């Protein structure tokens, strides 16, 4: 059995914070970090690290329910706790319109959203489009919040959660993200 890697949380937090600072110095000294906030561990820890590195005024949390969102209140609370500006964009009308447009292309009573691969991955891709639209508007950089464990097992949809201008947690497995948080 492989030996469990022990991390020094303080060293890792300093390392990540310095990496974020350097990234923004080189790639957008006046830019904001645009991050999707789900209320989960990854977006919460990433947002906290961004605040530490850039200051809360340069971090924008975007909450994107698809109609309903089980962790909506938690996501709002995360933004409030960190003191970051938050924007809520309900993507339900976008996903519904996309499904309708695709279904209209078929001659039969097709229902594309009944395909689990579509109904799971499409909202993630739409969320990433929303983040990039907001980043363009605010001269921001989009944050990828995936961790190493998700990348390893292929949990994240291509052009969805995996997209971003930079990744804060990609070197850390779930256990390490929890320790850092």
Predicted regions and their residues:
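A mobile, often basic/glycine-rich helix-loop segment
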Residues: 155-171
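Metal-dependent de-N-acetylase/amidase catalytic core
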Residues: 173-180
